[in-house]
Amino acid sequence: MLNDIQKSILQTVSDMVSIPDGAVNIRLDGQKEFRQNSEHIQIVSKTDKNGIDIRIAPFTKSENVHIPVILSKSGFHDLVYNDFFVGEGADVTIVAGCGIHNCGDCDSEHDGIHTFYIGKNAKVHYIEKHYGEGEGSGKRILNPQTIVYLEEGASIVMDTSQIGGVDDTKRYTKCEANGANSEVQINEKLLTAGDQHAVSEMDVILNGEGSRTRVVSRSVAKEASTQIFYPRVQGNAPCFGHVSCDSIIMGAAKVRSIPEISCNHVDAALMHEAAIGKIAGEQLLKLETLGLTPEEAEEKILEGFLR
């Protein structure tokens, strides 16, 4: 039974107010709190290490998988390995948020390592929200790793966001588009404040003929926080890739964006762009003339930027 704080975190990171249809696995402080399988999706605990295997039957359509994680014990360190086996022709949405509540003096940390094996012509929409809260001096640390292997015609859309309260994060994403006409789309949103620190590293490797990727990273760095981005795309076949990184910097924050594209085939077409800057004064002025305070105008602009 979840307490009120745990329920609030669950809703924040997964939009769950009750148990939804489909497969569900709720992890609380390193233990299985709740599990539900569906006819076409089975969740099984690993026997050799912490984590679960999620097996999605071929041609499963319009089903959801929720696997949220909650940490509510100060000083707790959680390492988990989750493997997803997505059958041919399946079309599913996977929600995998993580929230930490830390009111103590010791650091709390969750390291989630997710590996996807996406079958021929299968489609995956992966949604991941990270959030931290608590008045204690202990840090809230999240270090996710996401590894994806795509077969012919397979695709994944990854919507990942860090919506606040995470003191330290090191994010790593690796996608191998091995099959012909496979596709990777990554939409990353990141917010830091105070003295928080975030590193995001991505490798998208386009091996399949006609494979393609679009990587979009948007971030806001406030106060004295720091962010570093390393989005890398490698084209080893006739393929297309585009990387776009945009950051808003405020106060004494620091942001580094270091995109890299590598073409290893004459018919690989790759491009990147990066922009870092403050909120334009005319944007604030326009909203202030509509009756907003400077603080309200600033928040409205940031909200739209990270939407």
Task: Enumerate the language-model features and the residues they cover.
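C-terminal functional modules
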Residues: 1-26
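Conserved beta-strand/loop scaffold segments within soluble protein domains that form the structured core
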Residues: 20, 25-27, 33-285, 289-292, ...
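Small-residue helix-packing motif on alpha-helices
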Residues: 297-298
